[in-house]
């Protein structure tokens, strides 16, 4: 059978962009399907746009819930593309509909998983071990560091591997106060590890510190898939990009191998099909699971690559709870711009021993504050400030007094996979294209709830030690101590987990489907566990490792 392409990739975010980059460099003829539209931050970003230049003053829109200047088109709800949640459960699903996906507006916090994160069950008896070790993926973390560029500092911390770093920027004023406070409390506080360039790197200029990374960078100084991966892949002449292509199912032939992907052309509404020798899914953890579950046939009645029944299972998200406070030492400042990147300059990696605590996995702490450009709705909680709020001249004076005096601390921690957190096909609901949608089930265990309680206490202690006043009361057990709903941190992974045992996993150690040897997954789906680190750097490294393996298999004519 003749084929149109060597490889078909579904999804253009971190994993899909990396697969396109590596495979085109290796000589493969690749087609990339993206459900959203084209996006080029050099021309489409709202960077340096002032609020007064828009009638909305930067307020949220249906396509940009984080504000109309935000670099991500999509949101928690997309017209004509619903999802459902089981009764009594709490889960929110953020979906991007644009070239590059979520890499256009993410926080660029770029952390490697540590050795213990790949052997969690061995360490504490909970969750499962990965079929790979840190040593297996370390060379690919190194490659990602060298290609993309990341700033940070070499610290030698246990289970927080150092990388190949560019120099970090200096802490801003409020971050210096956080650092000094953490030093007194015995909390580790180090420079952030962020994929924003502080020096020219691989033909891309250094960041000029406008602080608007979330809008998309016109100078391409931060990491996004279109700017760093898809652009160079297009330059090879071996990548065909199809935007507005909503994947419906992975098609299979009589031998049980994947033959391509059926999709809807969203412009015309017509069904299309692209053929390829190899199919790589990178649509996001949940979208890829949905695609497999909807790819049913007589050979695969429960969905493609699902003989284990594990597709969609063991979803996790980063745990999250936040605390904000007002710091009197930062009040009444002369108006100024806090030079720096649009992300944190310092953060607090996990510093305690879980064996001495009542919860088994850790978290890190992220920091925000400073004099960022005001936008619509800024300081909307001023009525919570000491003597703040009111009307007229007094309100204006309060805005000036308190602007830049607030500091926020955010816990981002590890969730242990459980059998009650998963997605499945909703039997009664379809999207505007007639494709069955996902129904989510979610449960936080006592592990995560106790973790959130500990974090709330810790974050409040830091703000109090800074001499600040916390703005909200301590949450209690009725709200899981402030633990946000599943999906709200937008770090959902799992659903097509990797493993050595095909009875309990979907993919092997190279993210290759046990049941279909020419099918691979390179988004967050293969993750066996979450770790207390953000997932993007591991998605990139795993995708590079898998793509190298695909290239090798092609050379050996094994797929």
What spans do the regions from the language model cover?
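A conserved FAD-binding loop/helix module that cradles the flavin
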Residues: 529-547
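FAD cofactor-binding and catalytic pocket of flavoenzymes
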Residues: 77-95, 99-102, 106, 112, ...
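Glycine-rich loop(s) and the adjacent beta-strand/alpha-helix scaffold that form part
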Residues: 25, 29-53, 236, 249-250, ...
């Amino acid at each position: 059978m003749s084929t149109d392409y060597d490889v078909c990739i579904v999804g253009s975010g971190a994993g899909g962009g990396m697969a396109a980059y590596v495979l085109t460099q290796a000589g493969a003829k690749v087609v990339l399907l993206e459900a959203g539209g084209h996006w080029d931050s050099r021309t489409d970003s709202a960077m340096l746009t002032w609020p007064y230049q828009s009638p909305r003053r930067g307020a949220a829109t249906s396509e940009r819930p984080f504000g109309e200047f935000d670099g991500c088109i999509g949101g928690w709800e997309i017209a004509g593309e619903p999802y459902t949640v089981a009764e009594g459960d709490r889960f929110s699903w953020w979906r991007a509909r644009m070239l590059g996906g979520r890499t256009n507006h993410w926080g660029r916090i770029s952390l490697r998983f540590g050795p213990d994160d790949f052997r969690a069950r061995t360490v504490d008896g909970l969750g499962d071990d990965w079929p790979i070790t840190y040593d297996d993926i370390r060379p690919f973390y190194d490659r990602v560091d060298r290609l993309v560029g990341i700033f940070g500092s070499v610290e030698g911390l246990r289970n927080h591997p150092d990388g190949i770093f560019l120099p970090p920027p200096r802490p801003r004023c409020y971050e210096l106060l956080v650092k000094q406070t953490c030093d007194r409390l015995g909390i580790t506080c180090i420079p952030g590890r962020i994929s924003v360039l502080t020096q020219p790197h691989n033909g891309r200029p250094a960041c000029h510190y406008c602080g608007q990374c979330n809008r998309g960078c016109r100078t391409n100084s931060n990491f996004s898939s279109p700017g760093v991966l898809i652009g160079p892949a297009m330059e090879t002449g071996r990548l065909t990009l199809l935007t507005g292509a909503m994947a419906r199912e992975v098609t299979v032939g009589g031998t049980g191998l994947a033959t391509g992907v059926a999709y809807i052309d969203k412009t015309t509404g017509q069904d299309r099909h692209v053929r390829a020798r190899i199919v790589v899914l990178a649509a996001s953890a949940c979208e890829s699971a949905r695609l497999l579950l909807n790819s049913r046939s007589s050979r695969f009645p429960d969905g493609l690559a699902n003989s284990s029944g594990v597709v969609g299972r063991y979803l996790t998200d980063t745990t999250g709870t936040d605390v904000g406070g007002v710091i009197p030492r930062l009040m009444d400042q002369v108006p100024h711009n806090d030079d720096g990147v649009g992300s944190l300059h310092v953060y607090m990696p996990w510093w305690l021993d879980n064996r001495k605590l009542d919860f088994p996995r850790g978290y890190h702490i992220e920091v925000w504050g400073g004099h960022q450009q005001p936008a619509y709705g800024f300081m909307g909680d001023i009525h919570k400030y000491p003597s703040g709020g009111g009307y007229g001249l007094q309100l204006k004076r309060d805005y000036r007094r308190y602007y830049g005096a607030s500091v926020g601390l955010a816990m981002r921690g590890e969730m242990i996979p459980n059998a009650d957190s998963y997605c499945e096909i909703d039997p009664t609901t379809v999207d505007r294209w007639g494709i069955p949608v996902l129904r989510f089930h979610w449960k936080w265990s006592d592990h995560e709830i106790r973790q959130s309680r500990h974090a709330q206490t810790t974050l409040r202690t830091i703000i109090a030690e800074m001499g600040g006043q916390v703005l909200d009361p301590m949450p209690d057990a009725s709200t899981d101590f402030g633990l946000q709903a599943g999906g709200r941190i937008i770090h959902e992974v799992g659903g097509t987990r990797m493993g050595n045992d095909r009875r309990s996993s979907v993919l092997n150690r190279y993210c290759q489907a046990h049941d279909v040897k020419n099918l691979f997954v390179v988004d967050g789906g293969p993750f066996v566990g979450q770790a207390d680190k953000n997932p993007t750097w591991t998605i990139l490294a795993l995708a590079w490792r898998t793509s190298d393996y695909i290239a090798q298999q092609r050379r050996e004519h094994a797929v």
